[in-house]
């Protein structure tokens, strides 16, 4: 395996577990994801896809470019960056590229990455959370009858991203839920991942009218300076939801 180097703001999103790295590579193969390859300080770029993985020997095989001179520069490079940019960003680097002959033609071979970045972009992709067994966010708020005391407001999540969460709240709204209000010590128990301890800030409140049903609100919260540990938990849960969404879409196709 090759150990990759990442920039400082990507460190909290690094996947170290070999089984997770292998699973991510297999997902990229399964969904025929396009991978951008850059080298020569970004001067050379091409798009490829992963052909196969040999977990036993720790080898990953990718399609090679058609230009021989370009391929020579690629094979001579000692720092090549591989990025899947759409949806959840996947990134890793390799210092050793080899040209090989497979039964279907030429390919490039790299070592299975020891580390890779898996990053959900903040500005894209809110993933719906389970409806049958909703994920609950517990928010400490001032007690209505005794503001000096706190009570726990439990809200069901409807979606989540790396930037924040969406919750569904029945009318009437708790008076503490106003735009811009921040709450410390909020806990979300993400299934199969763990429990967060976050500061959440009310970002938006949208009234939802459904025929013959009481008025409800979608209350959106953003995370306020989450710790690396909390961001890691959120990122892993988002990745689980993305895989479930992809599997569902392919099953319905």
Curated annotation (Swiss-Prot):
Location, primary (coarse class): other
UniProt keyword annotation of Lipid metabolism present: no
GO terms classed as biological process: bacterial-type flagellum-dependent cell motility; regulation of bacterial-type flagellum-dependent cell motility by regulation of motor speed
Subcellular locations according to the entry: Bacterial flagellum basal body
One Pfam match: PilZN
Any one GO cellular component localisation term in the record: bacterial-type flagellum basal body
InterPro entries reported for this sequence: PilZ_domain, Split_barrel_FMN-bd, T3SS_YcgR, T3SS_YcgR_PilZN
Keyword annotations of the record: Bacterial flagellum, c-di-GMP, Nucleotide-binding
This protein's record includes keyword Signal: no
Location of the PilZ domain: 120-239
GO molecular function terms listed in the Swiss-Prot or TrEMBL record: cyclic-di-GMP binding
Biological function: Acts as a flagellar brake, regulating swimming and swarming in a bis-(3'-5') cyclic diguanylic acid (c-di-GMP)-dependent manner. Binds 1 c-di-GMP dimer per subunit. Increasing levels of c-di-GMP lead to decreased motility.
Quaternary structure, from the entry: Monomer. Interacts with the flagellar basal bodies.
Family, similarity comment: Belongs to the YcgR family.
Protein name listed in UniProt: Flagellar brake protein YcgR
């Amino acid at each position: 395996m090759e150990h990759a180097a990442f920039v400082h703001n990507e460190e909290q999103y690094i996947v170290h577990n070999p089984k997770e790295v292998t699973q991510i590579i297999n997902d990229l193969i399964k969904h025929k994801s396009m991978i951008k390859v850059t080298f020569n300080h970004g001067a050379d770029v091409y798009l490829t896809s992963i052909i196969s993985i040999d977990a036993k020997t720790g080898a990953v095989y990718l399609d090679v470019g058609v230009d021989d001179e370009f391929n020579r520069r690629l094979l001579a490079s000692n720092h090549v960056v591989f990025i899947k940019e759409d949806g959840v960003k996947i990134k890793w680097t390799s210092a050793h590229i080899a040209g090989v002959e497979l039964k279907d033609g030429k390919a490039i071979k790299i070592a299975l990455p020891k580390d890779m970045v898996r990053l959900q972009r903040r500005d894209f992709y809110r993933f719906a959370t389970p409806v049958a067994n909703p994920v609950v966010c517990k928010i400490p708020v001032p007690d209505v009858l005794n503001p000096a005391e706190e009570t726990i407001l439990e809200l069901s999540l409807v979606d989540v991203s790396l930037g924040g969460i969406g919750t569904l709240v029945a009318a009437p709204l708790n008076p503490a839920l106003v735009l811009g209000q921040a709450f410390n010590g909020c806990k979300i128990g993400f299934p199969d991942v763990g429990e967060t301890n976050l500061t959440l800030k009310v970002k938006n409140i949208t009234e939802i009218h459904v025929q013959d049903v009481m008025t409800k609100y979608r209350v959106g919260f953003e995370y306020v300076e989450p710790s690396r540990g909390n961001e890691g938990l959120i990122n892993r849960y988002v990745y689980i939801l993305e895989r479930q969404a992809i599997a569902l879409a392919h099953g319905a196709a």
